[in-house]
């Protein structure tokens, strides 16, 4: 967050209040300097000195464009200054008839008004009517919501725009994913295109060779370095550049980053069945009754029948029918009722106090199975693990 005067000059509220504060402080310090010290309250010197420090701090924060990060701190600091200036005003007016003291009292009154305005602004919510009215005059258009320098925000936006799928702190290729709500990642705004899905599930991600199921391949051993995320077939690239071993930007994914939102099934994406995301050996989408899958042993495209059942959510499976190989080791009780997102075929609905079987409880979304056999994912903050 670089220091720039343009950050300060583009905010009329910052210019007006800081300029007003400096003028009021000059009036106060001039009156204090011209008054007779035997009749001047000595503690007021500390109040005047403290006030100029607060004004300079606010100026620096505006110039660095990180005023929002210290709003609550400023409320406390300015509140102390407000006590100092009001107390000095009382002592200077009623305990002395000196012209210098009265001049200093006038400056302290102006500083008290300024401090009160700062307390109301910095202590108010950004969406409050007063704050929105003040921020509407900002030349930046968004008030102080955009923190940091322009290049910093530009890079952050580019990183978020390159997020292909899924959730949480994963690094795929050279795009860094910031932690955020998985439900937001699954919304229509951030849905990946078919091209990004093809690149994400192809044999290579970033600069490192991958299997079709996401496991990293060692170019020397031609074997996965870690357990396969799902599916039974691996596709090893034939042309691998060994210089990639020394590249720090090799993409990777770990099991903690998989929350079930990675499950997609597309006839254009090899190995993209539910088996590639949830570790389902049969490579099937658990939300519709179809025996075909994109993550089969051949790694070929999904059958055309799968596309006809994409939005079916109410198919129920028994243990013998699913063939998922998932062991549900825990039981959880639903704290609230939850209606599945119709845009996400992997979610399941449940009602309050319903008992669910769950597994893979590390992320925000857990694999779950209802009592009727329906399998999918559920939000972890809607359920509570039971002692078994």
From Swiss-Prot:
Subcellular location: Cell membrane
Region of interest (Disordered), residue spans: 226-319
Topology of this chain in the membrane: Multi-pass membrane protein
Low complexity: bias regions: 239-249
Sequence ranges assigned to domain SH3 in this UniProt record: 327-388
InterPro entries: SH3-like_dom_sf (IPR036028), SH3_domain (IPR001452), Sho1_SH3 (IPR035522)
Intrachain S-S bonds: none
Pfam families: SH3_9
Record key words, sorted: Cell membrane, Membrane, SH3 domain, Stress response, Transmembrane, Transmembrane helix
UniProt topological domain (Extracellular) ranges: 34-42, 87-101
Family under the similarity heading: Belongs to the SHO1 family.
PANTHER family given in the database record: FCH AND DOUBLE SH3 DOMAINS PROTEIN, HIGH OSMOLARITY SIGNALING PROTEIN SHO1
Role, per record: Plasma membrane osmosensor that activates the high osmolarity glycerol (HOG) MAPK signaling pathway in response to high osmolarity. Mediates resistance to oxidative stress. Controls the activation of the CEK1 MAP kinase. Influences the molecular weight and polymer distribution of cell wall mannan. Involved in invasive filamentation into semi-solid medium and plays a role in morphological dimorphic transition which is a differentiation program characteristic of C.albicans and which is known to play a major role in pathogenesis.
Name the UniProt record assigns to this protein: High osmolarity signaling protein SHO1
Taxonomic source organism: Candida albicans (strain SC5314 / ATCC MYA-2876) (Yeast)
């Amino acid at each position: 967050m670089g220091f720039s005067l343009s950050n300060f000059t583009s905010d009329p509220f910052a210019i007006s209040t800081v300029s007003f504060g400096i003028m009021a402080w000059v009036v106060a310090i001039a009156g204090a300097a011209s008054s007779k010290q035997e009749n001047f309250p000595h503690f007021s010197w500390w109040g005047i000195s403290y006030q100029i420090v607060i004004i300079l701090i606010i100026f620096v924060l505006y110039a660095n464009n990180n005023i929002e990060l210290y709003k609550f701190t400023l409320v406390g600091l300015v509140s102390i200054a407000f006590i100092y200036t009001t107390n000095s005003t009382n002592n200077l007016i009623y305990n002395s008839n000196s012209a210098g003291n009265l001049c200093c009292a006038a400056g302290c009154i102006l500083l008290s008004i300024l401090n009160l305005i700062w307390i109301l602004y910095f202590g108010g919510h950004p969406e409050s009517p007063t704050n929105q009215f003040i921020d509407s005059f900002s030349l930046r258009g968004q008030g102080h919501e955009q923190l940091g320098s322009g290049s910093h925000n530009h890079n952050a936006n580019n990183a978020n725009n390159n997020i292909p799928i899924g959730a949480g702190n994963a690094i795929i290729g050279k795009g860094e994913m910031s932690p955020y709500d998985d439900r937001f990642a699954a919304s229509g705004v951030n849905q990946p295109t078919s091209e990004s899905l093809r690149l994400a599930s192809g044999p290579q991600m970033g600069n490192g060779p991958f299997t079709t199921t996401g496991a990293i391949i060692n170019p020397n051993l031609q074997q996965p370095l870690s357990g396969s995320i799902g599916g039974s077939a691996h596709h090893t690239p034939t042309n691998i550049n060994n210089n990639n071993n020394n590249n720090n930007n090799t993409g990777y994914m770990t099991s903690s980053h998989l929350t079930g939102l990675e499950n997609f099934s597309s006839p254009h994406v090899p190995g993209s069945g539910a088996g590639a995301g949830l570790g389902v050996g049969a490579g099937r989408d658990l939300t519709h009754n179809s025996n075909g899958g994109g993550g089969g042993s051949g790694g070929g495209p999904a059958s055309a029948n799968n596309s006809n059942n994409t939005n079916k959510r109410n198919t129920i499976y028994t243990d013998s029918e699913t063939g998922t190989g998932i062991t549900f080791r825990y039981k959880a009780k639903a704290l609230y009722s939850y209606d599945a997102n119709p845009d996400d075929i992997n979610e399941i609905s449940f009602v309050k106090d319903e008992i669910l079987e769950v597994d893979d409880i590390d992320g925000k979304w857990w694999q779950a199975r209802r009592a009727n056999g329906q399998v999918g994912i559920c939000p972890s903050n809607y359920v509570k693990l039971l002692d078994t």
